[in-house]
Amino acid sequence: MPVKLDHETHVYTNTETGEKYTSVTTLIGNYKKPFDKDKWSKLVAKREGVSQDEILNKWSSITTTAQNRGTNVHLVMENYIKDKKIEQGYEELVDSFIKKTNGVILPNSKILSEELLFTHEFKIAGTADLVVENNNIFYIMDFKTNKKFNFINKYNDYFYEPIDYLPQCEFTTYTIQLSIYAWMYEQLTGKKCGGLKIFYLREFNDKTFWQEIPCTYMKSSVVDILNDKKLKDTKHT
């Protein structure tokens, strides 16, 4: 593999040149308005009548719990996809995935889990949760377990140029992420993207299931981002 991932540091490296590649998550983050943790934690602390440190510690605890949960659920799905192993207590969750991918994952499908994708030209890399190949058509799917999933931005925030026509929210962020994966997979294989899907973890009446959210392949936006990155990289060299 010409690019490797250090799972502890989450750094992608070109194995031949030693050059570090920008992760897809970091790349997208460069076009987002950063969250002002200091400002908002002070406001929340004042509103709730507690110290700022209490709010920051609370947020940190919530983040850690969510990350652990996400890691566990991803492992459950990875074990099923790779080995058809269903972990005890997750039968309903896996069953909801099977039913919702029935028309895409076929008996003769090529299934790739945790597939590392990259582009040497633009020096970026990322890992797709699931790639499904049916002959010359492929589908990319991603599991999301975060608590918040918005389709709009209530503060009317948008991404930075050159994608400043897109609202800054979870749905758009993930759509861009999967679109970049699709673009890289097209370049690596010559195959065509048949669809992108987010599987969002939901709970209702003590039942856990996947909500299937189709995404549009935003190829032109991906090209805009990549060309902008390349231009900025050139200016910095």
Task: Give the residues covered by each predicted segment.
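Catalytic cores of nuclease domains that cleave nucleic-acid phosphodiester backbones
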Residues: 58-163
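Charged, glycine-rich intrinsically disordered N-terminal tails and low-complexity linkers that flank
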Residues: 1-72
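A short, sequence-level motif marking secondary-structure junctions
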Residues: 26-29, 146-147, 216-221
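Metal-dependent nuclease catalytic regions and adjoining charged, substrate-binding loops involved
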Residues: 168-237
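A structure-centric signal for secondary-structure junctions around beta-strands
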Residues: 6-8, 15, 67, 127, ...
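Accessory terminal regions of nucleic-acid processing enzymes
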Residues: 2, 10, 82, 116, ...
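Secondary-structure junction/capping motif
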Residues: 20-24, 88-91, 169
